[in-house]
Amino acid sequence: VNKYPLWFLLSVYEEANQELIMTDIAQLLGKEAEDLLQHRCTTIPAENLYLPGADFVDRIMIDNNRPNTVLRSMQSLLNHGRLAGTGYLSILPVDQGIEHSAGASFAANPLYFDPKNIVELAIEAGCNCVASTYGVLASVSRRYAHKIPFLVKLNHNETLSYPTQYDQTLYASVEQAFNMGAVAVGATIYFGSEQSRRQIEEISSAFERAHELGMVTVLWAYLRNPAFNKDGVDYHSSADLTGQANHIAATIGADIVKQKMAENNGGYRAVKFGYTDDRVYSKLTTDHPIDLVRYQLANCYMGRAGLINSGGAAGENDLQESVRTAVINKRAGGMGLILGRKAFKKSMKEGIALINAVQDTYLDKKVTIA
């Protein structure tokens, strides 16, 4: 893989830091600023991690068995948008038209019924890539596939079947994604659901084929099981359970793992099922959010597979919440943020500003690895 010249990467990084950072991160974090920006992680040391950087492909991915074409595709992701040359990723995902229904997703901003505007939002916001359904990206692929990297989501839920099922169905093939010029494919597995073992088999095979064709693989490694709600606590975002989902994701060949940011811990103990170890809670984690996400990252082969956290649903304090998530992800050693609903449910101008604020977090040298 041919790297960009060092002078180019440094100039991009320096220019971004000096001229483009406009977000006052500490002010947005408010009372949490000192705790989040000064925290030192003493559970899993940073020196044991494989951290993001401009040389991520040459330093880390070069060890694995991926074809050269996959390394080239990963480098193209890392060299695009405002975060080019940093090793971090800012991804716009808009597959909610299937996952949550088009009406529920786009009624606030009907312009996003048109796939063109989804891609334009990603371009104008300086994202590394745009992730969406096969149909959305295929409908505008000839106009945009050479302007921004495409990530095609291969499988989805559907919300017309009643009662709701925790399942994912293949909507497109790896070959369809490749033929439209995508550099990456993504898929969801609902770990813990009745259909999870079939999903694991399907997506493992799909990722194998994607690598053969030279595409990067991204897994939405989500948990789905009513048993993970226990005594009023939702353990679908528990560090220990999501950590194991991440570990399986890396096992089946995910180059990047998308995971909800850990909000609690002790899911194994609460549901009284599966296997864990007391040292997970006494030595490898604390209650601090950065330490919880650090454990999620450890399960991604210590960062050999990049960890991106999701932005979550739109709400009243989206800017603050998004920057907070980005700070935690970056300081834990993660690779970036994949943020959709918080952006596209606003005007395009507001959505771009929010995405740029998240990117500022990854560009800011003062936000360091804990």
Which residues does each PLM region occupy?
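Alpha/beta enzyme core
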Residues: 105-129, 136-137, 142, 149, ...
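N-terminal capping/small domains of soluble enzymes
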Residues: 17-153
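Active-site clefts of carbohydrate-active enzymes
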Residues: 303-316
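Acidic, Ala/Val/Gly-enriched low-complexity intrinsically disordered segments
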Residues: 1, 12-16
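C-terminal helical cap(s) of enzyme catalytic domains, especially alpha/beta-barrels
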Residues: 344-368
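Short acidic/histidine-rich active-site segments
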Residues: 337-344
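Acidic-and-aromatic substrate-binding clefts and catalytic sites of carbohydrate-active enzymes
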Residues: 138, 194-197, 315-319, 344-348
